[in-house]
Amino acid sequence: MNNLEFALEMKNKRLASGLSQGELASLIHVSRYSINRFENGKANASRETQNIILRCLNYCICDKPFYLLVDYLSVRFPTTDALEIIRKVLGMKTDYFIHYDYGYYGYKEHYAYGEIKVMASDDEHMGVFLELKGAGSRNMEYVLQAQNRDWYSFLNRCLDCGGVIRRFDLAINDMCGLLDIPTLSEKYKNGGADCRCKNYENVQGGKLSGKNRNLASTLYIGSKASTKYFCLYEKQKEQATKKKHTDIINRFEIRLRDKKAVQAVEELLLTYNPHGLVFYLITDFVEFPDYPLWEIFISHDNLPFEMNPYLSIWNALCNGWKDRSCRQS
């Protein structure tokens, strides 16, 4: 993008956002004089400054820049009766589930409804293990919606039935592209972040084809072996490499295990304030000082806690049949 194209796009988006030049200047920590000169083509903004301005304006004109989802949940129940958990906790008929004579994580068998998996063992210490990965969480939302329930009532039911939360992941979907993952990765690498944990990992994934580079950047903050770490990645680019489309530009995943997962669920059920919980978990762990886009992100005051219910039983049944057929053969 040349400077004239940038100046035109900047002005159009600023006017669409309703921001004055002074308000925009305050958000991104530059002078109003500079904003005026950039907008009128009298000064050339650096590529970094252009990036910050346009990401900020895209955020300001977006109706719903962020929303929150449950992305992973696993719960262990102190019983060997998996069918009872299906009935009492999930509130479902056991006939809806396909039984498999194998399990995961050392479990003897499991029951599945779409991607909702309930694992069972004769060992009382292992108990019954409920696992909802990303697709499983969407399938569970389909069930909850049909039952006129939500995550709050479901999590309460898990605890009422003696469930122990083993893992709880929350995902912030960035719909406007405010989070600049490559820049955050570079700042973290160069000491531009304050973090309780110095462990980090930056991964580039995608396809290289001559000069046509379409790499999705992923930043892990914290140790993957710990009870709390973050995963930030460019979801739209990642999906594009798989020839899939999504409106989600970036995703910020908060991954919690064991004690941290238990504490987060208890806090959520006590306060019914997912916005406060999520931004406390983030700012208590990492900060990017003097970076305006990060300041805008952590100051965001509205984070809808949503459900995106989805279930394709036909695909689930076909996959189950193919899986069992392959194992029998």
What is the meaning of each model-derived region?
Residues 10, 24-25, 35-38, 315:
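Conserved hydrophobic/aromatic packing and binding residues within compact polymer-binding modules
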Residues 3-4, 12, 16, 59-326:
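Structured, helix-rich domain cores that form ligand/interaction pockets
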Residues 8-23, 27:
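Short basic helix-loop element that most often maps to the first helix and adjoining turn
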Residues 26, 46-50, 70-71:
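Charge-rich, low-complexity segments
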Residues 46-62:
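DNA major-groove recognition helix of helix-turn-helix/homeodomain DNA-binding modules
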Residues 28-45:
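Recognition helix of helix-turn-helix/homeodomain-like DNA-binding domains
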